[in-house]
Amino acid sequence: MCSSDLLGQLQDAGNTTTLAHYLELLAGAGMVRGLQKYTADAARTRGTSPKLQVLNTALMTASSGLTLDDARADREWWGHLVESAVGAHLANFAGSGTSAELFYWRDGGREVDFVLRAGRKTVAIEVKSGRAPMAHPGMAAFASAFKPTRMLLVGGDGVPVDEFLRHPVTHWITS
């Protein structure tokens, strides 16, 4: 069940305030945080369901029961894990007292995994765990709509995931 389905059910039950409070508790404990949708209109940002981002991938792997080899063999699971690791790296930076903010972006079927805004700089980040197709319609649509300072492909044919994680996030904002 995706977070928007869960939110819809809880809205029917009148528990959105409770859900928001639980998300705050999980974020305060350093476990999970909600990423808001990136938009030019701040009011519309608050009206969308957050994308849940784990802050430590051990939360995912501990409950999976998969060995490292099994996890890598399951392309879908590995893709979620790699995206979550990159997201955790970004979210931990954005939540560390910096002025940086982390979002996701989606418009119809087009999406960008992460949008990092630091001051006047905006970095669009797409994560791929395997070989990525050369076309990234979400990145192209985002670039057309928002003119980011930088667009970054992590994994696939872009920056290797291990290299991305080795550098502080400021490296990717300023270089």
How should each PLM-predicted stretch be described?
Residues G34, V54, Y104, E126, ...:
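Structural signal for conserved beta-strand scaffold positions within catalytic alpha/beta enzyme cores
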